[in-house]
Curated annotation (Swiss-Prot):
Keywords: Antiport, Cell inner membrane, Cell membrane, Ion transport, Membrane, Sodium, Sodium transport, Transmembrane, Transmembrane helix, Transport
Entry GO CC: plasma membrane
Catalysed reactions listed for this entry: Na(+)(in) + 2 H(+)(out) = Na(+)(out) + 2 H(+)(in)
Name of a matching Pfam family: Na_H_antiport_1
Natural source organism: Shewanella pealeana (strain ATCC 700345 / ANG-SQ1)
Family of this protein: Belongs to the NhaA Na(+)/H(+) (TC 2.A.33) antiporter family.
Alphabetized InterPro entries for the sequence: Na/H_antiporter_dom_sf, NhaA
Gene: nhaA
Official protein name in the record: Na(+)/H(+) antiporter NhaA
Length: 391
């Protein structure tokens, strides 16, 4: 188990660094003479037609609806494994990160709404600062190397996974519109098919892939966000086969490098290109970017720490062995790194009439995430023992 966690962390950490490069490259292109080419490329129309089925979307929508469905399937596989056999499989292990994650979603949303309560158009962005980018957070933590105890990394990992699960629920409940009854019926039939495969003990991944593709298309056409199909597919794939092997973990290991080194960097490159040419200090201090930035930088750690403290004081949870509040606090600050997850929610929240707020939202995400990463890194570096020293 410990070796699996270390492998996961090392891969996610490298991915976090690659994500940073993707964000910087997107920002450079979006604010250079090549900005027209950059945005034009992302708006390229791509059509898939099979018989009467016709899916016509821009490249950026294929990335957000298609590639990110694979990423969310990976999240689903991780959540299922952790719930059944991992860091969330017992109440004692799951309690603290669960309370922390709840606080870390409630408080950022509240901070955002404080700044945007009077505007119904911008109110829909309340969930943007509620997300944590696990790859970025682990990438920043990895810069401290072996000084970071595994227990602290596992706490961050568990918290971020629960946070991701919360984001999935938020997307399903609040960012699905114009529902198609026929597509929902087809999606329900596909889900029943996946459950049937699981119940019959089918361990081959091919049938899940075929039915899963049908589910993704149905969900895409239904008005519910297509990424949720990935989570449903993941939950239906068996964790253990009769011979002791794990189809779920096998798929998880196969998807990790694709997600870490291809899907998330592409998503970041496509969504992080904020045009700063028309921005000013007043733009930065407008309700949307200010609410998001402070939600990530202030609301996130405040919610995590307050809910964690209350849970420990009420004996509903315990701190990880060898860890104190001085260790948990900078990790809570690091959880304010929203980046790709926050940008994803932003792409769902600000559409149609609110599309003009997209760049403002991304600016707030970048500022809040960078500040959280910087402060969290130096704070954690200060409280951890020097390499070779004892804690």
């Amino acid at each position: 188990m410990e070796r699996a966690i270390r492998n996961f962390l090392s891969q996610e950490s490298a991915g976090g660094i690659l994500l940073m490069v993707s964000v910087v490259l997107a920002m450079i292109l979006a604010n250079s003479p090549l900005s027209g080419m950059y945005h034009g490329f992302l708006e390229t129309e791509m059509q898939v037609r099979v018989g009467n089925l016709d899916i016509d979307k821009t490249l950026i929508h294929w990335i957000n609806d298609g590639l990110m469905a694979i990423f969310f399937m990976l999240i689903g596989l991780e959540v299922k494994r952790e719930l059944l056999e991992g860091a969330l499989s017992s109440r004692a292990q799951a309690s603290l990160p669960t309370f922390a994650a709840i606080g870390g979603m409630v408080f950022p949303a509240a901070v955002y709404l404080i700044f945007n309560y009077s505007d119904p158009i911008t109110q829909v962005g309340w969930a943007i600062p509620a997300a944590t980018d696990i790859a970025f957070a682990l990438g920043i933590m990895a810069l401290l190397g072996s000084r970071v105890p595994v227990a602290l990394k596992v706490f961050l990992l568990a918290l971020a996974i629960i946070d991701d699960l919360g984001v999935v629920v938020i997307i399903a409940l609040f960012y699905s519109t114009d529902l198609s009854t026929i597509s929902l019926i087809i999606a329900a039939a596909a889900i029943l098919g996946l459950i049937g495969l699981n119940r019959k003990g089918v361990t081959s991944l091919a049938p899940y892939g075929v039915v899963g593709l049908i589910l993704w298309i149905a969900v895409l056409k239904s008005g519910v966000h297509a990424t949720l199909a990935g989570v449903i597919i993941a939950f239906c794939i068996p964790l253990r086969a009769k011979d002791g092997s794990s189809p779920s973990e096998s798929l998880e290991h196969s998807l990790h490098p694709w997600s870490t080194f291809i899907i998330l960097p592409i998503f970041a490159f496509a969504n992080a290109g904020v045009d700063l040419s028309g921005m000013s200090l007043s733009s930065l201090l407008s309700p949307v970017p200010l609410g998001i930035a402070l939600g990530l930088l202030v609301g996130k750690p405040l919610g995590i720490m307050l809910f964690s403290y209350i849970a420990v004081k009420l004996k509903l949870a315990v701190l990880p062995e060898g860890m104190g509040w001085r260790h948990i606090t900078p990790v809570a600050v690091m959880c304010g790194i929203g980046f790709t997850m926050s940008m994803f929610i932003s792409s769902l929240a600000f559409v149609g009439e609110g599309q003009m707020y997209g760049d403002y939202a991304r600016l707030g995400i970048l500022l809040g995430s960078i500040a959280s990463a910087t402060i969290g890194y130096f704070w954690l570096s200060k409280v951890l023992p020097e390499k070779g020293a004892k804690a």
